[in-house]
Amino acid sequence: GRVLLFFYICQQNINGIHEIMQNNLVIVESPAKAKTIEKFLGSGYKVLSSYGHIRDLKQKAFSIDIENNFKPIYEIPEDKKSVVSTLKAEAKKADMVWLASDEDREGEAISWHLFEVLDLDPATTKRIVFHEITKSAILKAIENPRDINIDLVNAQQARRVLDRIVGFELSPVLWRKIKPSLSAGRVQSVAVRLIVEREREIHAFVSETFYRVSAVFSDGKGSEVKAELGRRFATKEEARAFLESCVQAEFTIEDITTRPLRKSPAAPFTTSTLQQEAARKLGYTVAQTMMIAQRLYEEGLITYMRTDSVNLSELALSSSREVITSMMGDKYVKTRQFATKTKGAQEAHEAIRPTYMINETIEGTSQEQRLYELIWKRTLASQMADAELEKTTATISVSGTDDKFTAVGEVVTFDGFLRVYKESYDDESEQEDESRLLPALEKGQQLERKEIMAVQRFTQAPPRYTEASLVRKLEELGIGRPSTYAPTISTIQQRGYVEKGNREGTKREYDVLKLKGNQVTVTVRSEMTGSEKSKLLPTDVGSVVNDFLMEYFPQIMDYNFTASVEKEFDEVAEGKEAWTGMMKEFYQGFHPLVETSLAVKSEHKVGERMLGTDPATGKPVSVKIGRFGPVVQIGSAEDEEKPRFAQLKKEYSLETVTLEQALDLFKLPRTLGELDNKTVTVGTGRFGPYVRYDNTFVSIPKTMDPMTITLEEAEEMLRAKREAEAQKVIKTFAEEPDLQILNGRYGPYIAYQKKNYKIPSTVEPADLNLETCFKVIELQKAKGENRKARSVVKKKK
């Protein structure tokens, strides 16, 4: 028996040595990830990248065999053929192939496609997963390989096929009914619906006015007490009557209570909460956040960035405990494991956290450092003690009335997690800072009135969505998953259904009534209201497409239905439902709707709105979506005389433009004269009035009147335009529509979020990718900050 045991141990050791010495090929998705992993593995391992998916549905074909159980027809794209041939050659040389793509459904599908296309042998192929790129995680994964999880692959395939069916069948309907080259997507259409409905809510909102009363009292010992009245007044007269009743009134502390409060930290980051906080605290777009997080993950600095779990590993919990203890002491530690609330949370992921909690900072670009710091602070705070506060509430009675004032004081007695991190909100004004002390007060104490004010306020319309608040809403409704939030928000902007923009505020007057001494004074002040920055706004095309889909495809546009489809994908991922059965059920309900909508003949074109009659011709005036965007039309196609068209101005919308505004657009074009035997005209279009000459268009500035502009002025504008012709777009990026590489008067530059960044002369602008663009931006920002710092130093001298 002992001899057999000895031989068995020897054999195991030989097997282990063989595995170390053999030729191993590890395949991951990205070169950056490959580079990091290669550092952790020995010389027996070669790590190569597949550069994402190596096989997909054909881009311009339907590529689904409906009759053959919804079989997808895949192809290897032209730009991936050389990658595939390299991987095939290396796989043939390898004794063992390790498929190490990401651990989610998309990653599982990449591994499955690699297995199929490279024609790998199951006996010499292993699937490994990890949610952080650290040496211990990689070695542990190699010790615990598994097979490809076909349920996860099917869930990814189901999403891809279902979305292809919706896109390919719906888009031709939109081309025929609205305008050519439109496209529709399942989750995107529902996201557009949210934005359109919010815009209409805002337009329909009727603001109501009320008067809020606040007071400043003196305690007679040199301290002030600020308090608010418990009720609001509907009219100025009521507010004034109350203030006048306070002239002779006495103000007494009727009751005073002090109670302890505790505030607990937020859970560690999921994809959606990271996107929201990075938008609020750092001003990053959703796409930007994901791109930076991807780099941090691939460099082994944070865990996997697509997750809806708030769990932390035991190792993360213990290392957080050690860091908190060494930095702040035992009393700041409180180990917590948060419960994942999101329905259908995918796979056994962890929350997004630093791989090594001991690293408070990292090397890298300024953007990477800031996002890492945010993740580090949020993770650390989640494992810290509650903040302890003391809240004091004093009720102040007013003699001769039942009304009461309330004064509130709040003081932090132990900062706990607040020492490290404070969560942000979409509307910071809603989170009023009550951290103010009240002086020592006693029940029955008389207070002296200093002043009482009644300020006119207005009820607010709901705010427009930001990228961050839209992500939160989508998650709340159960629509989409961590991997889909960023692409959804990018796609609806690329398709021109939604645009990110600012709304200029309007000036509004409001009353302030003040009682000081025995006199009530009334003053009128003004404020700007309704101004918004970087909000998601529906375009006319987005609104019209939304209305059409709501009418003919209510199921596709239903929030609950979209969420239920996500749940079905989850069921497929868990092996509880066959993906083909899910497809069949969906298609049987969806396809007949497509055929019905194509067959319906409507009297008016979709989105058309009648404004009235043109007094000059007696013909109908309407607005609709034309081939190149929203237009005003005088007359109809049935008339002998062709209808006249004018492009709708950018500041007008199909839903709100008036007859008068529409008719004004027909006062142009007017002819100014000729230059070099070619006519110069003034016209108006989507973006306002312009001068046109030989297919050259120049916008007329707001300071000039298009009805009085002269030929000489137009000639000067055309000359300036020719000089500025260098303003040509060198490159744009679909995933970040706000960013462009342009050629300007002083050379090439990057235009991003209404700011320009010079491109160094050593760099070829056309070769820049999105990642290097952001590095150039960071570099220029840093230079700007250094210049500012130097100028401040000079001023101090």
Model-derived features: positions:
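Conserved short loop/turn motifs at secondary-structure junctions
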Residues: Q22, D102-E103, K179-S181, T258-A267, ...
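Intrinsically disordered, low-complexity regulatory segments
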Residues: F7-R160, E169, G230, R336, ...
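Short helix-coil junctions and helix-kink-helix linkers
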Residues: T273-T285, V471-P482
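Short, polar/flexible loop-turn hinges at active-site or ligand-entry regions and domain interfaces
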Residues: I73, S101-E103, L120-K126, P145-V153, ...
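C-terminal or mid-to-C-terminal helical accessory/interaction module adjacent to the motor/catalytic core
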Residues: I133-A215, T258-R262
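Basic, low-complexity terminal or inter-domain segments flanking catalytic cores
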Residues: Q22-L25, T36, Y45, S171, ...
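Metal- or metallocofactor-binding catalytic centers and their adjacent structured scaffolds
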Residues: A234-P268, E442-L447, M453-Q456, N560, ...
